[in-house]
A protein has these predicted regions:
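Integrase module of LTR retroelements
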Residues: 1-198
């Protein structure tokens, strides 16, 4: 039966169209060090250019580099550095604790003096990915690709409904086994596997 499911999924036209092609990056890229606990090291990015859905057009993607878990937060517009800090505190820090390191791109939210001051205040380093090598924030870029493919599949018939489906995309990512850890992000964080869809 497992083989039949894999064959069915591989033949699904919507799924095939939704997946991105992947190529190896050029040049020597070294992986970031493996953190010692969940949510101590985080990567974040914004996904923009989405159709307006329930008043939202932006997604803040936050990835735990230890468990590979993600938080996906829909927003009406790109937030300021201070608004970003408030969102990250509300959705991540207050639940999982303060991080030691935050990796992000060089967007104005993350390269501002406000963001740097907030990171210093909580005792975290703010690491900016190279402008010429966005792969240095590769875990978040990978989650972005997976999330976009999942959303395309979920909203193929109504693209403007992505905001309502975003929690399902987050759940799907967090309960599926991650190849680097051999566990689902959920299991890696909490020690048990939640039920999959009935």
């Amino acid at each position: 039966m497992e083989r039949e499911v894999k064959d069915f999924v591989a033949a699904c036209a919507t799924g095939v169209r939704s997946k991105d092609l992947r190529q190896r990056p050029q040049g020597l890229l070294l992986p970031l060090p493996t953190p010692s606990r969940p949510w101590s090291h985080q990567s974040m990015d914004f996904v923009t250019g989405l159709p307006v859905s329930e008043g939202n057009s932006v997604i803040l993607v936050i990835v735990d580099r230890f468990s590979k878990a993600c938080r996906l937060i829909s927003l009406p517009k790109l937030p300021s550095a201070f608004e970003t800090a408030k969102l990250v505190f509300l959705h991540v820090f207050r639940v999982f604790g303060l991080p030691q390191d935050l990796v992000s791109d060089r967007g104005p939210q993350f390269s501002s003096c406000v963001w740097q001051a907030i990171c210093q205040l909580i005792g975290a380093t703010a690491s900016l990915s190279s402008g010429f090598h966005p792969q240095s924030n590769g875990q978040t870029e990978r989650v972005n690709q997976e999330m976009e493919a999942t959303l395309r599949s979920l909203v193929a018939d109504n693209p403007s409904s992505w905001s309502a489906k975003l929690p399902w995309a987050e759940y799907a990512h967090n309960v599926l086994q991650s190849s680097p850890t051999g566990l689902s992000p959920f299991q890696c964080q909490f020690g048990f596997q939640p039920p999959l869809f009935p």
